[in-house]
A protein has these predicted regions:
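A metal-dependent, Asp-based hydrolase signature
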Residues: 72-113
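Short, acidic loop-to-helix structural element flanking the phosphoryl-transfer center
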Residues: 105-142, 179
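Asp-based, Mg2+/Mn2+-dependent phosphohydrolase catalytic module
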Residues: 2, 6-31, 133, 145, ...
Length: 256
């Protein structure tokens, strides 16, 4: 199977829809945030790399090690784990990352505000927002399940109209792909895992959700996801924009 995880620091991609179906009656949809309801994380990070003059090789070397470790079968504790579980503050993570990065002009990377700058180009994908509203309007329960890179930037005022439950990794001390966080999200909807669809742009998270009984849907773009989800739920989910490169500015710029 090709690499399908949309994670900053990994630059080789095979985008496709991957669906793992459990056969149960589906009553809830749980969605990731960054890279699903927002434009792709890789695109966002590349914009920051260029704007801040970051040496791409230094960033890729650091993030490859941390991300592979974070999602590998023998994952051990590293700064990504700590940040996503809320065990490390955003400011602490910025110091750790900045110390390992290089700039193309040889200057020191500024740690303060690094995460804000890194995700500043993140844009909402209106078609995905419309899809979630349509799912909820059809009587299904909806939840947000996000690995946070800082917990204070989500557009929470929008959440009551979108979600019946919200699970942020840094607020619950768990992170994807740990199975406990998927079970926690299902419980927040009052459902069994087998009654839920998980939408995520990282295939490791889709596989982990499927392992605990959920139907997993790997997100590649809005049109494909809406079509696949509509087929799963048996409801029309029209109007998804086939381009994830368009959207509106998102204040939620430090989460995945």
């Amino acid at each position: 199977m090709g690499r399908t995880c949309d994670v900053p620091g990994l630059d080789e991609w095979t985008f496709k829809i991957v669906i793992v179906i459990n056969g149960a009656q589906l009553r809830g949809v749980i969605t990731d945030w960054g890279g699903v309801l927002t434009t792709p994380i890789l695109t966002t990070v590349q914009a920051w790399i260029q704007a801040d003059g970051i040496d791409w090789d230094s960033y890729r070397t650091v993030m490859r090690a941390w991300v592979v470790d974070a999602y590998g079968p023998d994952a051990s504790q590293n700064p990504v784990h700590a940040l996503e579980r809320g065990e490390c503050s955003g400011a602490e993570f910025e110091q750790i990352l900045a110390a390992r990065l290089l700039r193309t002009d040889g200057r020191v990377v500024t740690a303060d505000g690094l995460l804000q700058r890194m995700f500043a180009a993140s844009m909402r994908v209106p078609a995905m927002y419309d899809m979630i509203r349509a799912v909820r309007g059809a009587g299904f329960r909806t939840a947000l399940l996000s690995n946070s890179w800082g917990c204070d930037e989500y557009p929470r005022a929008d959440f009551p109209g979108l979600f019946d439950a919200v699970v942020i990794s840094g607020e619950c001390g768990m992170r994807k792909p740990e199975q406990a966080i998927f079970l926690h999200a299902a419980k927040g909807l009052g459902l069994e895992p087998e009654q839920c669809v998980l939408i995520d742009d990282i295939e490791a998270n889709v596989a982990a959700a499927a392992a605990c009984g959920m139907t997993g849907l790997h997100h590649a773009d809005a049109a494909q996801t809406a079509a696949a989800l509509g087929d799963l739920l048996g409801v029309p989910l029209d109007g998804a924009d086939p381009s994830t490169g368009t959207g509106t500015p998102s204040p939620g710029n430090t989460m995945r």
